Amino acid sequence: MNASNKVRIGNTSVTKIEGQVAFTTTSDKRLKNHITDLPLGLDFITQLRPVEYLRNNGAEKSKEWGLIAQELQQTLKTLGYKDAGIVTEDSTPEKYMTVRYNDLLAPMIKATQEQQKLIQAQAKTISTLLRRVEALEKK
């Protein structure tokens, strides 16, 4: 741990970090304030470009999946989020860009909820149209 309360495990030579249990983050309401509904949802998620790639430093040449930090940062900026904290520079001299992937979970949930509302509205429209077609066919 350094003076800015950051813990760094390894460097670009590290190929894997493993554990026996899932990583957890506190999410207790008592630790939060100024809570509002997240506006980022389907529009945000559909603007992201998921990619597969090989790491330049990867000893194992297995493909990984993710996002390009610079592209994510630009998408957030376009949507008015200049400093969302999800994309940052690390503390190395190279200042590599980092992504807090767990922060994508909330917008993905929001996107799924928005998509479900669209699906339900479309199902209702389809049902109405089918009834109208059936009524016309009976004439």
Each PLM stretch: what is its role?
Residues 55-65:
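Short acidic/polar micro-motifs at solvent-exposed secondary-structure junctions
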